[in-house]
Amino acid sequence: MSSPDCGYASDDQIQRSCSLPMMMGQYQWTEPRTVFQEGKPKRDEVSANSRSKAEARIRRPMNAFMVWAKDERKRLAQQNPDLHNAELSKMLGKSWKSLNLATKRPFVEEAERLRVQHIQDYPDYKYRPRRKKQVKRMKREEECFFPSANIPGPEAMVNNVMVGQKYKMQYSVQNLQENQLPTAGYFEGHSPMGYFYKDYDVPNYYTSQNSSGYCSPPTQDEYQALSYGFGSSYMPYQQTTTTPVMAKQISVTQNIPQESPEHGMMASPQMYNGQMYLPECAKTHPVAQTEQHSPSHQSQQMVSQNYLQSQQDGHLETDIDKTEFDQYLMYEPKSDPELIYTIDQDSGPYSTNLLPSLISEANNVCYYDYCGV
């Protein structure tokens, strides 16, 4: 009797059984089976080696508490199977402390016997404590405090460096622009002599641009000359009309050695004339500058004319007391005697004619400043 499937099923079963090993042999995932089977003996060998090392390590002899807790721990573990080993250790410690000496004596004697036996078995034994794993704990704590997710990558670090350099460049350029020249309000009404010449009609740098007396702010070089111009004889602006006395005065002051700031202040002719340091725009506006002269300039011309008349009448410098003007001067007392002494020692041709002029001009300047004119 023929089968209901007409013999196809048997042929399919034979074909599948024959083709299955051929197909399985082409894939690589079938090979690790042998590797897995071969890996089992290796793991067994590693575990056996660890056990042999543990057995080879010499243990320390037990003390009385360990001898007593060996059997007591087992009893507590059977009574309280849910308790953790740490809880069992706490309970054993409390119960051991509560025991009296008579109860502890057999365990103490057993511990002493084990110690003697250990010495006999291992005469060269030396206790070597295990290394504490503090380094690994510290590393773990650092990883917890500083997780790797918060550490920026190399690209972020490069971006931070570029941003820092850009900010530093902007800051340096801003500082350079701010430090090149002071603010506009700094030069308003200021002069090299400061307090002593604040009441005079000194032309300001920052006036209206529409006025004829307007001049641009000083450059950096002019600002340096302004701040350090006390001892220099640089005169960017001079009067067009000079008297013979002023010519003698300029020639003599160039020969005076400048040993202190007071000498430099008294040696510059613009200090006597009441003229402050003016920028180069003063040359382009001589009319506007001449209209703003101080009263000391007019009085100076009168003093010089009176001095010429007194020289023609035969007055000598010996008739003048050199110390009577000290009470009117607002400078340091040593500045004028030093200047007088230096001028007296000068052997120039105009040394005898310069002293009265200097004293009268200094008195005139200080008088106007004291009276607030």
Swiss-Prot record:
Zinc is among the record's keywords: no
A GO CC term attached to the entry: nucleus
Database matches in InterPro entries: HMG_box_dom, HMG_box_dom_sf, Sox_C, SRY-related_HMG-box_TF-like
Superkingdom, taxonomy of origin: Eukaryota
A biological process from GO: positive regulation of transcription by RNA polymerase II
Primary site of residence: nucleus
Chain intervals with Basic and acidic residues compositional bias: 39-55
Keyword Transcription: yes
Assembly and interaction partners: Interacts (via C-terminus) with ctnnb1/beta-catenin (via Armadillo repeats); this interaction is required for inhibition of wnt-signaling.
Full protein name: Transcription factor Sox-17-beta.3
Taxonomic source organism: Xenopus laevis
Originating gene: sox17b.3
